[in-house]
């Protein structure tokens, strides 16, 4: 029974449909994360529903910014290192956030963390300072 195989006949069409579906998922995940960030910014509280961890990572939002209500420390949590299922909504992470400086001061884990927003880059990632002639700082 000769003739072209099903892979040869339909392979390109199926791969193109898979690629369109992947792009559509990325756009939808990005929109959900942006909407959640806007709700967090404008409502100022734990906005529900929140996107799942996997959707945030798929959209490129790798970090979750958390603020301690006690010492006003802002930290970024890398979502790719969490030991939680990817289907876990982000708002459920708030109950597990502990502020390290406040906990060390008290001597036991102390919960004061509040979710701020999802971020694409880490908080410590910033542009290099402009260099000026005569600047005495060490430049490596």
Residue ranges and their predicted role:
Residues 1-140:
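Basic nucleic-acid-binding interfaces
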């Amino acid at each position: 029974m000769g003739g072209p195989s099903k892979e040869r006949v339909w392979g390109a069409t199926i791969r193109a449909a898979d690629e369109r579906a992947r792009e559509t998922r990325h756009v939808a995940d990005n929109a959900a994360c942006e909407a959640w960030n806007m709700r967090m910014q404008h409502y100022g509280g734990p906005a529900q529903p929140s996107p799942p961890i996997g959707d945030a990572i798929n959209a490129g939002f790798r970090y979750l910014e958390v603020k301690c209500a006690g010492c006003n420390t802002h930290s970024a949590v890398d979502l790719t290192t969490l030991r939680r299922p990817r289907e876990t909504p982000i708002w459920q992470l708030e109950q597990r956030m502990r502020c390290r400086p406040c906990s060390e001061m008290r001597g036991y884990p102390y919960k004061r963390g509040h979710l701020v927003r999802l971020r694409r880059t880490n908080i410590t990632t910033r542009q290099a300072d402009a260099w000026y002639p005569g600047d005495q700082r060490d430049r490596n």
